[in-house]
Curated annotation (Swiss-Prot):
One of its GO terms (biological process) is cytokinin-activated signaling pathway. Induction: By cytokinin in roots and shoots. Disruption phenotype: Dwarf, albino, lesion mimic and low fertility phenotypes. SUPFAM superfamilies: CheY-like. The lineage of its organism: Eukaryota, Viridiplantae, Streptophyta, Embryophyta, Tracheophyta. Crl5 mutant plants overexpressing RR1 display significantly increased adventitious (crown) root formation compared with crl5 mutant plants. This is Two-component response regulator ORR1. Coiled coil: none annotated. Belongs to the ARR family. Type-A subfamily. Expressed in roots, leaf blades, leaf sheaths, shoot apex, flowers and panicles. It comes from Oryza sativa subsp. japonica. Two-component system major event consists of a His-to-Asp phosphorelay between a sensor histidine kinase (HK) and a response regulator (RR). In plants, the His-to-Asp phosphorelay involves an additional intermediate named Histidine-containing phosphotransfer protein (HPt). This multistep phosphorelay consists of a His-Asp-His-Asp sequential transfer of a phosphate group between first a His and an Asp of the HK protein, followed by the transfer to a conserved His of the HPt protein and finally the transfer to an Asp in the receiver domain of the RR protein.
Length: 231
């Protein structure tokens, strides 16, 4: 069930601090207009502990899970299956993220019940896909009622293809995806650090003045205050 006034509570699961920061910055940006409240954990086991705190009969603590695919100890795929088994009558929407666009991996997750599969890093164009998978939205990314295999949105270009007939596209560079996430974090950090530049400049001037004063006192004590070339 969604939070008050249309706020979707998202449980973010990712072992990468950079990728967690990218998602948090994006979903808390002005473009999202307060549509999401993000709770972040760094492992699938911690996510299971969080979900296990729910008492039977109570409302769900979160509205959807956004998880990385590759994580140590317990993968995002294993977390997906555990969540679907945890609440079969009222399943929690699960969106899987990965830096590799592999059709077999996408098909595996979708067949296990994932609502969507997004290639990292998460971008502004992916926000609507998260909204589509909200419990309040009946047009989520499910299989059609005709029993045909689900049509998957490959996140690299958002072209709809059939998972059973698509030829494997060249996987995107993991390094490129990682660098894009790092660049986004560095950009936000540079904005925050810019406020400290005046203070840093004044501090450097103060240190320089202290060093100059120390040199003058040293020359004075040696009796050569006016001799600039005194050794």
């Amino acid at each position: 069930m969604e939070g008050g006034r249309g706020v979707t509570r998202v449980l973010l699961v990712d072992d990468s601090p950079v990728d967690r920061r990218v998602v948090q910055l994006l979903l808390s940006s002005s473009a999202c207009a307060g549509s999401f409240h993000v709770i972040a954990v760094d492992s699938a086991k911690k996510a299971m502990e969080f979900l296990g705190l729910k008492e039977e009969g109570k409302e769900q603590a979160i509205d959807m899970v956004l998880t990385d695919y590759c994580m140590p100890e317990m993968t995002g795929y294993e977390l997906l299956k555990a969540i679907k088994a945890l609440s079969p009558l009222k399943p929690i929407p699960v969106i899987v993220m990965s830096s590799e666009n592999e059709p077999q991996r996408i098909s595996r997750c979708m067949n296990a019940g994932a609502e969507d599969f997004i290639v990292k890093p998460l971008q502004s164009k992916d926000v609507q896909r998260l909204r589509n998978c909200s419990p309040a939205n009946t047009q989520c990314c499910d299989a059609g009622s005709d029993g045909k295999p689900p049509l998957l949105l490959l996140p690299s270009d958002h072209v709809v293809v059939d998972a059973t007939a698509a030829s494997p596209p060249p996987p995107p560079s993991r390094r490129r995806a990682h660098f894009a996430g790092v660049a986004m974090v560095l950009h936000s950090s540079s904005v925050e650090l810019s406020h400290y530049f005046p203070f840093l400049f004044k501090f450097i001037l103060l240190v320089y003045a202290i060093l100059c004063l120390g040199e003058l006192l040293h020359r004075w004590s040696n009796g050569c205050f006016l001799n600039l070339w005194c050794a």
